[in-house]
C-alpha cells in the first residue's frame, strides 16, 4: 500500500522535533451543493527542527513515531511572509 502524501500549512512548531500541520480540503455539501472548506491537523516529525510556523510543507505517512505522530515532514514547499519576518 503506497504512503499518503499531503500538503499543508504549519500552525505550530512549539514541540521538540514536532510540527502541527493543518491540511485543508474542499468538499461539496451533499444537499445544497456549496463548496465548503474542511481542515484537519496532523502532528508530524521534523528531525532537524528546521520548519517554522506559517510555512507550507509536504508530509508523508509513516509508522507510528509516538502516540500522536504518524507523519513525517518530507520537504518545505514555500515559506510564508510571516515566517520570513520571524527569521529577520
UniProtKB/Swiss-Prot annotation:
GO cellular component terms listed in the entry, alphabetical order: cytosolic small ribosomal subunit
Record text on subunit structure and interactions: Part of the 30S ribosomal subunit.
Gene: rpsQ
A GO BP annotation: translation
Family: Belongs to the universal ribosomal protein uS17 family.
One Pfam family here: Ribosomal_S17
Protein name as catalogued: Small ribosomal subunit protein uS17
Main function: One of the primary rRNA binding proteins, it binds specifically to the 5'-end of 16S ribosomal RNA.
Keywords in alphabetical order: Ribonucleoprotein, Ribosomal protein, RNA-binding, rRNA-binding
Gene Ontology MF terms: rRNA binding; structural constituent of ribosome
Record carries keyword rRNA-binding: yes
